[in-house]
Regions:
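Pyridoxal 5′-phosphate
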Residues: 1-133
Length: 133
């Protein structure tokens, strides 16, 4: 089975548009936001139009539906990664995710496999966003 970039692009409606001088859109700022395929756009539209409520914040039907969808997504991600559901966290951005990892490593108990020691080094490139340093 071969990988077809053209077929993947068809799943993302934003890539049907052109930008300056009629050039095809190429989006490389995925750290800031990710472009959405039709499956995500449709799922979000369905959620916001039929089930929108705060997750884990209410005892009414919409809150239960929202919570079930949220926890269902967690189960799917855990299964995909071969992880336990309680090992999966959702964050709002790449920066928040990187900060969560940094805090977890910085606060890990000595002897924990994620604990940093004085002899450890963290290597980053000049290309890293300032928020990730």
């Amino acid at each position: 089975m071969s990988f077809s970039v053209a077929d993947v692009r068809k799943d993302f409606p934003i890539f049907e548009r052109t930008i300056r001088d009629g050039k095809r859109l190429v989006y490389l700022d995925s750290g800031a936001t990710s472009q959405k395929p039709w499956s995500v756009i449709n799922a979000e539209s369905d959620f916001y139009s039929k089930h929108n409520a705060a997750v884990h914040r209410g005892a009414h039907q919409l809150a239960e539906e929202a919570t079930d969808a949220y926890e269902g997504a967690r189960a799917i991600v855990a299964d995909f990664l071969g992880a336990k559901e309680n090992e999966i966290i959702f964050t709002k951005s790449a920066t928040e995710s990187i900060n969560a990892v940094a805090y977890a490593m910085g606060n890990a108990e000595p002897g924990n496999r994620f604990a940093l020691t004085a002899s450890d080094s963290i290597v980053v490139t000049e290309m890293e966003h300032h928020a990730n340093l």
